[in-house]
Amino acid sequence: MRLKTSIECARWLAFQACAFRGHDESLNSKNRGNFIELIKFTSTFNDKVTSVVLKNTPGNAKYTSPTIQKEILHILASNVRNTIREEIGNAKFCILVDEAWDELKREQVAIILRIIDKEGFIKERFFHIVHVRDNIALALKNEICVVFSHYNLHIENIRGQ
């Protein structure tokens, strides 16, 4: 029940594009971040959840740590990417690539795929973020190729960039 609650809360926050963490997640904080606050909110509707989350759990089995949150997000992201991959099939697609710096001043590249769905509508799907060491064209191409290879997307199917 604890893990299910954490997964569902993480899923809701992710699909609503909400931040997970707060500035002060200490026990005395009035707002411990969206993830913890959503778990607390969820527990108000279900006595079973109330009995097994947050204060009522052993310290090593709360399933609320930042590490657990990241693992849940990683699994959700993999599921989304696999769904996008299935949606593309062997069709042609375009890629959009954008560079930015993360909070640790590391350069990262976002890969977005533009596809035409079965109804003929153009869709853009955020697909992946890759940290890159160098932003020269060859290095970026190699990183993109690694991502595409991992998801069995063929470079020959790219029709624009």
Please provide the spans of the model-predicted regions.
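Extended, charged coiled-coil/helical-stalk scaffolds used for oligomerization and assembly
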Residues: M1-N152, G160
